[in-house]
C-alpha cells in the first residue's frame, strides 16, 4: 500500500502524479500553475504523440496513420514516449496529463515503468459546464463542435472512470471541484500540493 518501490538501478524513482479530467475541465491551465508554483514538469501524452509525429520518425508515421484510421495508439507507444521524456528530463517530479486514458493504459504504465503514481488529481466538472467552456473558447480546434464534444465526454466517462475508481479504492484520488473559477480551483489544488497537506497525507 504505501510501500516504496525498489529503485531500478537509477537511484530514486521519480514522483508521478496523473492528472485526469474531461475535455474542458481546465486541467491544462491548472497544470501550468502547478509547474510554476511547485516545480513539476508537465508531460502531456497528446503533446508527446504530436511531437513524435512532427519529428517524421518511423514511429511518428505509424502513430499518424493509426490516428488517421481512428485507431487507438497502443499503450506501449505512449508509455515509451513518456518514459523517454521522464528519463531525459533532469527533474524528478512529473505531472502526467491525459494519461492513463483507460485501465489497460494504467496497468501497462505500472508494469513497464514500475512507477505507481503518488496520487491522481481528478478535475471533476459537470458536463454542461465543460460543454459551455469548450463551445465558448473554440480555439480553432475543428473538434470543438457539439457532436464531437459529446463524443469526447462519452469516451472520457467510459474509459477514464474505471481508472479513477481503481485509484479511489487505493485512496489515491484527490478530487477537485473544477466547476469553480480558475483561481478558486487553484486554491483547492494548493491545499493538496502545499507541504503541510503532504505531511498530513504522509
UniProtKB/Swiss-Prot annotation:
Its EC number is 2.7.4.14. Pfam families: ADK (PF00406). It is found in: Cytoplasm; Nucleus. ATP binds at residues 24-29, 137, 180. InterPro entries: Adenylat/UMP-CMP_kin, Adenylat_kinase_CS, P-loop_NTPase, UMP_CMP_kinase. Keywords: ATP-binding, Cytoplasm, Kinase, Nucleotide-binding, Nucleus, Pyrimidine biosynthesis, Transferase. Binds 1 Mg(2+) ion per monomer. It catalyses: CMP + ATP = CDP + ADP; dCMP + ATP = dCDP + ADP; UMP + ATP = UDP + ADP. It is an enzyme of class 2 (transferase). It comes from the Eukaryota. PROSITE patterns: ADENYLATE_KINASE. Gene3D superfamilies: P-loop containing nucleotide triphosphate hydrolases (3.40.50.300). The keyword Nucleotide-binding applies. Coiled coil: none annotated. GO terms for molecular function: (d)CMP kinase activity; ATP binding; CMP kinase activity; dCMP kinase activity; UMP kinase activity; UMP/dUMP kinase activity. Its cofactor is Mg(2+). One of its GO terms (biological process) is pyrimidine ribonucleoside monophosphate metabolic process. SUPFAM superfamilies: P-loop containing nucleoside triphosphate hydrolases. A ribonucleoside 5'-phosphate binds at residues 50, 71-73, 98-101, 141, 152. Belongs to the adenylate kinase family. UMP-CMP kinase subfamily. Monomer. Catalyzes the phosphorylation of pyrimidine nucleoside monophosphates at the expense of ATP. Plays an important role in de novo pyrimidine nucleotide biosynthesis. Has preference for UMP and CMP as phosphate acceptors. Does not act on dCMP and dUMP. Consists of three domains, a large central CORE domain and two small peripheral domains, NMPbind and LID, which undergo movements during catalysis. The LID domain closes over the site of phosphoryl transfer upon ATP binding. Assembling and dissambling the active center during each catalytic cycle provides an effective means to prevent ATP hydrolysis. This is UMP-CMP kinase 3. It comes from Arabidopsis thaliana (Mouse-ear cress). The lineage of its organism: Eukaryota, Viridiplantae, Streptophyta, Embryophyta, Tracheophyta.
Amino acid at each position: 500500500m504505501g510501500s516504496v518501490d525498489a529503485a531500478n538501478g537509477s537511484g530514486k524513482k521519480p514522483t508521478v502524479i496523473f492528472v485526469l479530467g474531461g475535455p474542458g475541465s481546465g486541467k491544462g491551465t491548472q497544470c501550468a500553475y502547478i509547474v510554476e508554483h511547485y516545480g513539476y514538469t508537465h508531460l502531456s501524452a497528446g503533446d508527446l504523440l504530436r511531437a513524435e509525429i512532427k519529428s517524421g520518425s518511423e514511429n511518428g508515421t505509424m502513430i499518424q496513420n493509426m490516428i488517421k484510421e481512428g485507431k487507438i495508439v497502443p499503450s506501449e507507444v505512449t508509455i515509451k514516449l513518456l518514459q523517454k521524456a521522464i528519463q531525459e528530463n533532469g527533474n524528478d517530479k512529473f505531472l502526467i496529463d491525459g494519461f492513463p486514458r483507460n485501465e489497460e493504459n494504467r496497468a501497462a504504465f505500472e508494469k513497464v515503468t514500475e512507477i505507481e503514481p503518488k496520487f491522481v488529481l481528478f478535475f471533476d466538472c459537470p458536463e454542461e459546464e465543460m460543454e459551455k467552456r469548450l463551445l465558448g473558447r473554440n480555439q480553432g480546434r475543428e473538434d470543438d463542435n457539439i457532436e464531437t464534444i459529446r463524443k469526447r465526454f462519452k469516451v472520457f466517462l467510459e474509459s477514464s472512470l474505471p481508472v479513477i475508481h481503481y485509484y479511489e479504492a487505493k485512496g489515491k484520488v484527490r478530487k477537485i471541484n473544477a466547476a469553480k473559477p480558475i483561481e478558486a480551483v487553484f486554491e483547492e489544488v494548493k491545499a493538496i500540493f502545499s507541504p503541510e497537506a503532504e505531511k498530513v497525507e504522509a
